[in-house]
Amino acid sequence: STRVRSSAASDVYKRQVDVACSSGKDMEKFWEIFDERLELCHEALMYRHNRLKGTPSDVAPILWQNGALARLKKGETIDKLLYNGYSTISLGYAGLCECTRYMTGKSHTDPEAKPFALEVMKHMNEACAKWREESHIDFSLYGTPLESTTYKFSRCLQERFGIIPGVTDKNYITNSYHIHVTEEIDAFDKLSFEAQFQELSPGGAISYVEVPNMQNNIDAVLAVMKHIYDNIMYAELNTKSDYCQCCGYEGEIQIISDEHGKLIWECPNCGNQDQAKMNVARRTCGYIGTQFWNQGRTQEIKERVMHL
C-alpha cells in the first residue's frame, strides 16, 4: 500500500513476515524473495514519485507557495522539491520480530538471532542507498506503525500460511523492529536493545515502554526519561488513562471476550460495556487516541506486558 504525507513524497510497506514464510526457512530462498519484493517496492515508490511529477504548486498554495513547505511561484511545478533531500520517499517495514522468529526459531532479542535481524535492516538500508545514488531521490527506511492494517496483514498471513505458533497465531503483527508486546523485558533493556535498530531506521522510528500509573513514582519516570535521552533517538512511555461515564471509575478499562469470542471493553467497577459511555486512552502508532480499534489492534493492546 502507498500513502502521501506532508514532508514525505510516498511510503510503501514491506511485509517481512510474508517473505519469511514464503521461503520455507530456506535462507538462500529468503534473500532471493527479499530482493524480489524490494524491487517491487522500488517500482511502487517510483510510480508514486512519477505520479507527483508535474503537480502545480497551485493545488495547495499554503503548502507550496506561502512557505509551509516551499515558496514556489504560481503555476510552477513541485518537481524540484522531489529530489536531493528536500522530500523523502519511504520504504516501510513491519514484522521484523515474527520474520526473525520464523527464520531462526528465536526472538530477535536472542543473541543467536539478533545478527539475522540486524542484517535484514542493513540490507534494506543498502537498497535505499543504492536507489538514492541512482536517482537523487531521498529513499529512506521507515519503521511502519501499521495502525489498523496490522489486522488485515495478519489475516492475510493466516490465509496464506495457516497458523504458525509465534509467527501467524495472533491477529496482529509487530510494528517495525519492536520487541513482541508479550515478551517479558524491563524498560531499560528494551530501550537499549531497540536503540540498535532505530539507528538503522533513519526514515522514521519510535520505541515504547509500557508503564502503570506513575503519579506516585516520579523518580522512576525520570530514570526512564534519562535513559531515553542517553541511549535512544525517540521513545515514549505508555500508560493507561480511562474513565467510565456510568460510574465515574478512573483506571484501566478491561478488554474481555464476549460469548462470541469478540474482544470488547468493560468497566471493571460497574460492568459497563457501552463504548459510547466510556473514555479509553491508549497509544497506537505514536498517538494517544480515545477512539476504539479493530480486533487485531485490540488484541495487541490487551496483550501488552508492563516494562516497569
Report the location of each language-model feature.
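Single conserved hydrophobic/aromatic residue that forms the stacking wall/gate
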Residues: 2-9, 13
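Inter-helical turn/loop segments and adjacent helix faces that build the functional surface
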Residues: 20-32, 102-114
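Short secondary-structure subsegments characteristic of cysteine-rich extracellular domains
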Residues: 35, 109-128, 298-308
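Flexible, glycine/charged-enriched surface loops at secondary-structure junctions
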Residues: 44-65, 111-113, 128-142, 235-240
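A glycine-rich phosphate-binding loop feature that marks nucleotide/adenosyl-phosphate handling sites
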Residues: 54-75, 121, 137-152, 242-251, ...
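Catalytic alpha/beta core of large soluble enzyme barrels
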Residues: 146-151, 157-255
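Cysteine-rich micro-motifs
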Residues: 258-272
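Long insertion/accessory domains within large nucleic-acid-processing enzymes
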Residues: 269-308
